């Protein structure tokens, strides 16, 4: 692994002979780019992975704060996330992100709590006993809670008509009161779609509900990382890519993609189809204590500079695995149908905010919980994963809780001090032991553009992996994966990009098959 600015020059295989493996540059080191790079390297390509930040992982990353390992955002996955689980297996990390034996979520409200736990019944019957006893719904609401579940089974998430409807309107039409939508349906849709349930695309919500809640009985079982995300994804990916012979260049921001005429080269060595030109990386992170996770490096004050500002990498193929705004700037305008690039900007963005609270004593024994009738949405115990349990002074029993706030438009610009005034009392309402505890530390991380805005009409704006230019493909959870903007969607997009390259460049010296990481495409 090479950090740009180090002593090693940019390396590439040189001119490509008629039977040489293809040279592929993957731009972007998030989950989509990591997945594409692994799949292509396993297929025999010479792969160079470029990442503007000083580490891999994209939005799923970690940084260190006063000896504490902090994830910029809390991420979980479900049993139905087969592509992501396949990636964990490739990285050797399955044991470090274990799935629950059975879906089991504690739901908190001030002064009350409930438990949603699936039974051993086959899907979709496995959740019915828990819903029938769910105390946060009235008897009348529980009597009709199965209506949308039954109706949802007949929906096709790929139907364009569903993408024109709001999930909240559809639930209301199927007998779900405003209270029922907040107390039950929003628990899952808001965190999965990063938008208020009432405002979400029905097509994307249907994917979540049908696949996660109405599919196999174990489809909604929750997996929670037991390692910091930087170790789970970025470090493990760097190790695997090195073993596969791929090059990883960090601090390498791409400024432009130049398209060549491959036939214009002299002699028997055709020119590369693309030249990837490098620029300087993004600027510094936000102030300590209030980290903007959208910045280039939330762990340090300044990102490293690129050592070769005029560098360029030749490539026979390019995987563009960056956020949709960056992709629109980098894609050569002649490669896509008129208006396609401009339509990406209409995808917009939704923020996620994480509120981090360290208490001087334990306040709960729950590993995680959801909440209703509270500004808290989900809360996670990060005492062990952050290293706090091992590194605090002798005799100290501090506990570190992280609140994950999806669809956080109302909070993303609120100062940390104001968020403290709101969320410390909210935690005390949910955890009585917190009322007598002292807050040892409080800080906030913000992902301003965590996902695209998954509102009605958004599915229609998502492009496929392929472009009009053979050899240039798109990846990212914002592309048309059939899934919402999640870790699963990101991994599926990387696989789709790798498969598309093989499909459109059959003459290259690929290995027998491209990895699908156990997923049917």
Regions found by a protein language model. Name each.
Residues 22-49:
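N-terminal Rossmann-like FAD-binding beta1-loop-alpha1 element of flavoenzymes
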Residues 70, 84-85, 89-90, 94-207, ...:
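Mobile amphipathic helical/loop "lid" adjacent to a hydrophobic cofactor/ligand pocket
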Residues 75-82, 159-163, 174, 216-240, ...:
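Short beta-strand to alpha-helix junction loop
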Residues 2-8, 19-20, 103, 252-430, ...:
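Mid-domain catalytic core of redox enzymes
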Residues 62-87:
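N-terminal glycine-rich dinucleotide-binding loop that anchors FAD/FMN and/or NAD(P) in oxidoreductases
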Residues 479-501, 505:
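A conserved FAD-binding loop/helix module that cradles the flavin
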Residues 386-395, 447-474, 478-481:
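FAD-binding beta-loop-beta segment adjacent to the flavin cofactor pocket
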Residues 41-65:
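Glycine-rich FAD pyrophosphate-binding loop
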């Amino acid at each position: 692994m090479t950090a740009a600015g180090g002593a090693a020059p940019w390396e590439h295989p040189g001119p490509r002979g008629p039977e040489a493996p293809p040279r592929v540059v993957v731009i972007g080191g998030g989950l989509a780019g990591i997945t594409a790079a692994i799949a292509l390297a396993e297929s025999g390509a010479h792969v160079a992975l470029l990442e503007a930040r000083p580490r891999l992982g994209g939005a799923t990353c970690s940084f260190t704060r006063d000896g504490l390992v902090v994830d910029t955002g809390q991420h979980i996955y479900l049993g139905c996330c087969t592509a992501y689980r396949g990636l964990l297996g490739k990285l050797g990390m399955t044991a470090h992100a274990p799935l629950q034996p059975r879906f089991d979520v504690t739901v908190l409200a001030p002064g009350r709590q409930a438990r949603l736990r699936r039974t051993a019944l086959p899907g979709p019957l496995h959740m019915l006993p828990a819903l029938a006893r769910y105390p946060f719904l009235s008897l009348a609401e529980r009597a009709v809670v199965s209506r949308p579940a039954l109706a949802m089974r007949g929906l096709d998430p790929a139907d364009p008509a569903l993408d024109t409807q709001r999930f909240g309107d559809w639930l209301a039409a199927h007998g779900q009161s405003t209270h029922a939508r907040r107390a039950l349906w929003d628990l899952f849709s808001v965190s999965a779609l990063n938008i208020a349930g009432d405002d979400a695309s029905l097509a994307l919500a249907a994917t979540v509900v049908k696949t996660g809640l109405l599919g196999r009985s174990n489809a909604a079982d929750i997996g929670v990382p037991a390692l910091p995300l930087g170790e789970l994804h970025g470090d493990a990916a760097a190790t695997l890519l090195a073993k596969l012979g791929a090059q990883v260049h960090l601090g390498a921001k791409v400024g432009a993609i130049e398209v060549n005429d491959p036939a214009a080269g002299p002699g028997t060595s055709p020119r590369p189809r693309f030249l990837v030109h490098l620029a300087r990386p993004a600027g510094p992170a936000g102030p300590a204590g209030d980290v903007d996770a959208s910045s280039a490096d939330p762990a340090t004050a300044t990102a490293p500079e690129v050592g070769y500002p005029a560098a360029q990498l030749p490539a026979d193929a390019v995987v563009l695995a960056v956020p949709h705004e960056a992709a629109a700037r980098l894609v050569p305008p002649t490669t896509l149908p008129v208006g396609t690039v401009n339509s990406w900007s209409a995808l917009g963005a939704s923020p996620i905010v994480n509120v981090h609270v360290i208490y001087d004593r334990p306040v709960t024994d729950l590993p995680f919980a959801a909440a209703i009738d509270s500004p808290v949405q989900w809360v996670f115990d990060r005492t062990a994963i952050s290293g706090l349990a091992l590194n605090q002074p002798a005799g100290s029993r501090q506990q570190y809780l992280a609140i994950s706030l999806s669809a956080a438009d109302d909070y993303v610009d609120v100062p940390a001090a104001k968020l403290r005034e709101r969320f410390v009392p909210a935690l005390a309402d949910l955890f009585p032991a917190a009322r007598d505890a002292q807050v040892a530390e409080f800080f906030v991380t913000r992902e301003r553009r965590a996902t695209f805005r998954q509102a009605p009409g958004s599915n229609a704006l998502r492009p496929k992996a392929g472009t009009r230019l053979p050899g240039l493909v798109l990846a990212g959870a914002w592309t048309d994966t059939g899934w919402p903007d999640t870790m699963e969607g990101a991994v599926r997009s990387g696989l789709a990009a790798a498969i598309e390259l093989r499909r459109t460049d059959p003459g290259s010296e690929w290995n027998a098959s491209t990895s699908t990481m156990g997923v049917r495409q």
